[in-house]
């Protein structure tokens, strides 16, 4: 045990060890509060006195939630060594998070944004106090879990930190080589003499490497054999990197350098976030000082990301979930353009559903009027694009599975097991994403069908109403016989109008029949969707199988992790170790088999089926559009015919009225008795009123039809 005036600790409770100090978990003697104590070793005291006290001075200047707090500086009882009493972060570091096999291919989007927010806030506080850290890396970013279960990351280890204004330089070299700025790497690692001085932007390079590591699970610059074994090539990669590139690798000994301008396909960040992040990485991983961003621009661009809100959009034509990052004060027009950039669906062809209801987005309004979305509850984008659904693009985890060496090698076996387990967790993540994608496909199509069924029903009601009035009009006795129309021209016009109305009635009857057929077809498709939605619950068993394999593999992995530090195993322990390797390999094979044969194949079949259904829905929507146009045209023509009939009847009524008021000479005997004039006038007035009502109803129908069928036809391809 060791102690200071107020704290004590056991040397077995080691949290971390560096070149100049060790960190232990300690307790307050009075309260029992857990803290971290940093105890400096003899190497630390060989440094100049001003360097020894620098870390105390730096920490005393800082007070921020994203920087590890300094509680006190005390001395040990016997040797009177200086001890820093600091905040204890119980959940390890960002490095330990990234070392977890679950994060082999990088953090989830939610956790990455937490890291970005915390690191940016902590670095901003350093800059406000004129401090340069000089050793930013995942191992120096500590993690604790807040009361609500959220991660909080804090910058730590200020042994290399010092006060430095923006226009000042320093010449001493600190840092960890994989995260070092190339100029510092050249002098510190390659030991090449140079007279360069370094500024505050060296921290930006380290931040860039750290963020890339957090996003992908791997370092951005990797020579053949690794950074520690091939230092000259490591330096070449960082200094010869083309503008805009964010990573470089050498896959063969003495092979060419390969550059990438985007994050790898295994990265779990959405394309929406990647599009925002990649330009930042490209501009801070820049070796030339005049081309590299300064802190002001870095803070501005990262803050811009963190201030954005994410809107989840599931594109039915593509069968892909998109994350659209925009500011709440942006207009919806900007949101629609952002969707276009990711989906290639132009704003005028974008139609949205949210939770089963049509969602009309007014371009002039602000984006804060858009409903709150989540990955499980996105806006559903529906357009008449005829493209084949592409679905989620991913790399088969089986391609990243390393193989065990035949002999027993505890360190190599541990590393291999870790790699295999990482691929297994990637398969589990992908299986969940693929299953969620299938559910969103089925749910989105179900909602579209409901909207189309409503359109069918309303179109039928409008069409049948128009048919009812036309039938009533055509069945009028006076109109049918043409009685009271002595004028041949008037009789001819009325007959032609009657014929036209009969034709319109036949067209509307055909439209009604077509809508009914479409309705029946959509109902059949809806029944298929319900069956498939029930099947989704069955597919969830595949994920349970993968999880079961992973649980067993993780248990063996923990045994390997424990054994790797041992010098060797007894005979019996070695036999058990060999059996564990065999079982681990069998479990991995079973896991990947379930993923490929059940998850991936089911997803691919779902994509093909989804494409066929989308084309069927597209045909139905186009058909309804044409029917709606026909009904609207028929209503318009019927209105015109009724207006013409009204004019004929109005004129007839005027003529009859004038005949009744005039003195008329006796008429010769007609071969057949004519209708009573009073009776005729009464019927004409009645018919005229009916026709006017019909005209008004047809106008209302037309307006309703126009509202129902404002559906764009398929865009030109």
UniProtKB/Swiss-Prot annotation:
Post-translational modification: Sumoylation by TOPORS upon DNA damage is required for protection of cells against DNA damage-induced cell death. Desumoylated by SENP1.
Gene3D superfamilies to which the protein is assigned, alphabetical: 1.20.1270.420, Phosphatidylinositol 3-kinase Catalytic Subunit, Chain A, domain 1 (3.10.20.90), Phosphorylase Kinase, domain 1 (3.30.200.20), Transferase(Phosphotransferase) domain 1 (1.10.510.10)
An individual GO BP term: positive regulation of type I interferon production
Description of what induces expression: Induced by lipopolysaccharide (LPS) and TNFA. Under high-fat diet, highly induced (via NF-kappa-B) in adipocytes and M1-polarized adipose tissue macrophages.
Keyword Phosphoprotein: yes
Tissue-specific expression: Expressed in bone marrow-derived macrophages and at low levels in liver and white adipose tissue (at protein level). Detected in muscle and lung.
Subcellular location: Cytoplasm; Nucleus; Nucleus, PML body
GO cellular component: cytoplasm; mitochondrial membrane; nucleus; PML body
Leucine-zipper as annotated region, ranges: 452-473
Result of changing residue 38 to A: Dominant negative
UniProt crosslink position (Glycyl lysine isopeptide (Lys-Gly) (interchain with G-Cter in SUMO1)): 231
Activity control mechanisms: Kinase activity is inhibited competitively by amlexanox.
One Gene Ontology molecular-function label: IkappaB kinase activity
Modified residues (Phosphoserine): 172, 665
Pfam families: Pkinase, TBK1_CCD1, TBK1_ULD
Enzymatic class: transferase
Residue numbers bearing the Phosphothreonine modification: 503
Crosslink (Glycyl lysine isopeptide (Lys-Gly) (interchain with G-Cter in ubiquitin)) position: 30, 403
PROSITE patterns from the UniProt entry: PROTEIN_KINASE_ATP, PROTEIN_KINASE_DOM
UniProt keyword terms in alphabetical order: ATP-binding, Cytoplasm, DNA damage, Isopeptide bond, Kinase, Nucleotide-binding, Nucleus, Phosphoprotein, Serine/threonine-protein kinase, Transferase, Ubl conjugation
Record text on subunit structure and interactions: Homodimer. Interacts with MAVS/IPS1. Interacts (via protein kinase domain) with TTLL12 (via N-terminus); the interaction prevents MAVS binding to IKBKE. Interacts with the adapter proteins AZI2/NAP1, TANK and TBKBP1/SINTBAD. Interacts with SIKE1. Interacts with TICAM1/TRIF, IRF3 and RIGI; interactions are disrupted by the interaction between IKBKE and SIKE1. Interacts with TOPORS; induced by DNA damage. Interacts with CYLD, IKBKB, IKBKG and MYD88. Interacts with IFIH1. Interacts with DDX3X; the interaction may be induced upon virus infection. Interacts with TRIM6 (via SPRY box).
Family note: Belongs to the protein kinase superfamily. Ser/Thr protein kinase family. I-kappa-B kinase subfamily.
Protein name, entry field: Inhibitor of nuclear factor kappa-B kinase subunit epsilon
Organism: Mus musculus
Gene: Ikbke
